[in-house]
Amino acid sequence: MKIDEVNFKDKTKVTVFSGMQPTSSALHLGNYLGAMGNWLKIQDLVTKNNKEEEELLNLSESSSSSSSSQSTKINEKHKLIFSIVDLHSLTSTKSLSPKELQSNTISVAINYLACGIDPEKVILFNQSMVPAHSELTWILNCITSFSKLSNMIQFKEKTKSSNEASVSNGLLSYPVLMAADILLYKATHVPVGEDQTQHLEFTRDIAQAFHSNFKSKFFPYPSIITSEQSKRIMSLQDGRLKMSKSDPLEISRISLTDTDDQIKLKIKKSKTDTIIGITYDPINRPDISNLLSIASETSGIPITDLQSEFKDKSNAIFKEFLSNSIIKNISPIREKINYYQSNPKLVRDILLQGSEKANKIANKNLNIIKDIVGLYH
């Protein structure tokens, strides 16, 4: 479903969970326009809805104490839980050093905050600070078959060029950890990209298996929230590949920490083609089509209008427009990144407070799960 299709006004509690790996020290433009854009829209929708309901209650309740009590319930009705999933990073074939992983975790938190994630409205924490994620993963691993995990598309893709002896059990059970992340908070909705939809289907399957094995219906079956982004953001050097933090070519992506000059240089060096004119044709002209998508997303101008405006203009003129459009989006984020980098204690405190809130929910649910399974605690 799309974000606008989520009924935040329904009486049923909505809990949204999503996470991002700290595989790099900075998010890129694709992250910002894709997953982060989704998160920000959800944050705005939930905040607006909670505020409207609170105002209605304040009008209808004559007792201030009663109103205060009801407002607390409203604020707890919809939960937004966003995590830096550092445990998932350990499954990467290109492992980060301990210092890199810790540094990246703080850097990604800074990027979240700079993009607009508000810790007053969202539970923001890093995954490894909530031990219940690992405990639930083990429980779910015990009801998941090897054949189901080994047939997951991403596992096959990541291991097809690897020696079997070098493939870790962590990579195999990656979907189980992801399922635990989601089910631990009884998430009802999860915003994901196209490449993660099978993992969400797996999460629903594992919830069903848990209910069947233990004769208990504890977990909701989470719904997938698909991206509102009209076009995927691809590599600046290959319009057929997704823009990625792990791409060894730095010029393939725009990082949120890039200076104006770096952005201009990367766009100047971005791959196009020899065909005259700026037209949108993802099949035959993937590179220029990708640049048009980025221009549309960052400027708010429809691709059809951009084609009309630049159809007879050179690539250089179009790239100048694109650079300025990206800079307009990124420069205020970069300023906020600099602010949080100068205040590391503030960032650590935000993660600590977020982990305390997450632990409270996670431990409560895990204890119920242990009772269902028969684990003494």
Swiss-Prot record:
Its main location: mitochondrion. Gene3D superfamilies: HUPs (3.40.50.620), Tyrosyl-Transfer RNA Synthetase (1.10.240.10). Keywords: Aminoacyl-tRNA synthetase, ATP-binding, Ligase, Mitochondrion, Nucleotide-binding, Protein biosynthesis, Transit peptide. CDD domains: TrpRS_core. ATP binds at Q21, H28, L29, G30, N31, G193, E194, D195, K242, M243, S244, K245, S246. It is an enzyme of class 6 (ligase). Pfam families: tRNA-synt_1b. GO terms for cellular component: mitochondrial matrix; mitochondrion. InterPro entries: aa-tRNA-synth_Ic (IPR002305), Rossmann-like_a/b/a_fold (IPR014729), Trp-tRNA-ligase (IPR002306), Trp-tRNA-ligase_bac-type (IPR024109), Trp-tRNA_synthetase (IPR050203). It catalyses: tRNA(Trp) + L-tryptophan + ATP = L-tryptophyl-tRNA(Trp) + AMP + diphosphate + H(+). Its EC number is 6.1.1.2. A motif ('HIGH' region) lies at residues 22-31. L-tryptophan binds at D181. One of its GO terms (biological process) is tryptophanyl-tRNA aminoacylation. It is found in: Mitochondrion matrix. It comes from the Eukaryota. GO terms for molecular function: ATP binding; tryptophan-tRNA ligase activity. A motif ('KMSKS' region) lies at residues 242-246. Belongs to the class-I aminoacyl-tRNA synthetase family. NCBIfam families: trpS. PANTHER family: TRYPTOPHAN--TRNA LIGASE, MITOCHONDRIAL. This is Tryptophan--tRNA ligase, mitochondrial.
